[in-house]
Each structure stands twice: as structure tokens, then as C-alpha cells.
Amino acid sequence: VTRFSANLGFLWTDRSLPDAIRAAAAAGFDAVECHWPYDTPAAEVRAALEETGLPMLGLNTRRGDVAGGENGLAALPGREAEARAAIDDALEYAEAIGALCVHVMAGVAEGADAGRAFVANLRYACDRAAAAGRTILIEPLNRFDAPGYFLDTTEQAADLIGTVGAPNLRLMFDCYHVGRTEGDVIGRLRALRPLIGHIQFAAVPDRGPPDHGEVDYATVFAEIAALDWDMPLGAEYKPDGPTDATLGWMTTLR
């Protein structure tokens, strides 16, 4: 039986984060995850998690100046102080709510200086997270949805994980992003399995529910199970209506 995590950055966005956690529990999800929870008091989130018994798998570092086109800070040369403050904030919030992982967002950048900044900031994040037993995640984003994002392929992510050399740095493997950029989702899952810390999914190419599109998720989920993966898979898709009306796939794909 496949277990699923509701990504509350996309699901039940018409509700407060605590109420979205409750909705995910009522719908039969096994875990939750979120994007940027910082506007919600951590105590309210923790209370909803304790009430429902759902684990919070992860959250993202802040993106920076979103209106100005920023999409993360950790690979921006000269912005190390801001990047590390964002990492500290994320780890502090994760500690307060009991979240397992923090996704460190690289940002829109390119070149060797950006690579060096990202490696240094990831080492900082991993050192800080290790003390609390947390995992740091990095995620390649496809170039159609996130043009200019520093990290856009799984190969680049694998190289970064090797360079940083921290045992608690892992790949967030989003089948949607990999499907858009690289294809061969199952082949990449098999090749990268030792590096993966979390798996997400959505239909390719429209990022809708996983019951349609170019990727056959029944096959993908069976392959993931065959790879001895037992953590909940992150449903990070964009509902084409009220979230509760888009959950038929949970029955057919579980």
C-alpha cells in the first residue's frame, strides 16, 4: 500500500494551514508537507499536527524578493547572510513543529560563483540541521516553470550532494520536474535511489492530479515500492477545482 503526503502549498489553499492539515487527515493522507508556513504561528501548526497525528515531512526556506523574481537565496553570491538567516528561520520553524526536512532553495543564478555559494550555504545548513537530526533537501526545478533556477537536473543535484559531502543532504525527487526536464522517471529513480530523501509527484505536463498525463503513476509507484521506499510520497499537484473533488486517484493508485 502506497502512503501519501498532502503538499499544502497546493492542496486546500483556501484554508488556514492548521485547517488544511485537518482536511488532509480527514481525506486519508498519511503525512503533510508545506512550502512557506512562516505567516502561521508555529504553535497552531504543531497543535493541528498533534491533533491529527500526521507528521510534517518538510518545508522550504524563504525565496527572498518574490515580486522581484527571486526564487531562493542559497546560490546567490554575496547574499550569504540572507541565505543563512533563511536557513536558520526554516530550521527554527521545523524544530517548533517537528518537521523532518528543510528544502534549501537555490535561487535564480548561474556560474561558478553561484555554485560555490550554494555549496558553502548547504554545508552551513547541513551542519546546523545535523545537530537536530534533520535532513536538508535540494530539488531540481524544471526550466519551464522556474526559468533560470540554479539547480535544474538530477545529475547536477547528485554532483552537488557529492561535493558537499554531508550525510544529511539528500535529493528531493519530484517526478513532475524530472518528467518535464529529463523524462525516464523510473530510470532516474533507480539510478538515484541512494541519494533520495523525499519523492513528490504530479501529472506531466500540466501538474494536475496524477491520474492522467504522460507519466503512468501506477507503474511509477510500483517501482518505488520495489526500491524499498516506505516513506509517504508527496502529492504536490495543482487541483483543477476543490481539492476534495480531485482525490479519486488516492483510491485507484494506492
Range-by-range predicted roles:
Residues 1-5, 10-28, 89, 98-99, ...:
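Histidine-acidic metal/acid-base catalytic patches
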Residues 39-48:
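Active-site-adjacent beta->alpha loops and helix N-cap segments on the catalytic face
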Residues 66-74:
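Active-site gating loops and adjacent loop-to-helix segments of metal-dependent hydrolytic enzymes
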Residues 73-170, 180:
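Active-site acidic/histidine proton-transfer and metal-coordination neighborhood
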Residues 25, 50, 95, 130, ...:
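Anion (oxyanion) recognition and catalysis
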Residues 10-12, 38, 61-65, 106-110, ...:
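Active-site-proximal loop/turn and secondary-structure-junction residues that shape catalytic pockets
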Residues 30-39:
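A short beta-strand-loop structural module common to alpha/beta enzyme folds
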Residues 33, 58-60, 103, 137, ...:
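Conserved beta-strand positions in the central sheet of alpha/beta enzyme cores
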